Amino acid sequence: MYQIVGKRGSGKTTKCFERARKQGAIVLCTNKRAMRVTADELGYQDIEIVELADMKDTARDQKVVVDEALYVFKNWLEKAFSVKVDAISFTEN
């Protein structure tokens, strides 16, 4: 799995759009309206953008690029299981 890592404002979202275009992938995010505006401003009108609720209609073999994966995961856990995520851990490259 390819990883895009960087600080806030370092171009991670742009790299997600680039990766999605190159791989023929969709972009999964927490707010598709805001992401659509960003994509359009950056010239990525061809990229499909979805939220978790849209994933049930996505083809099983569809490639997905996840923007801000920790927030997407947190939102999924909190909505699906009515929990409040307090902390997470992850392994750095």
Would you name each region that the model predicts?
Residues 8-10, 69-72:
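Short beta->alpha connector loops
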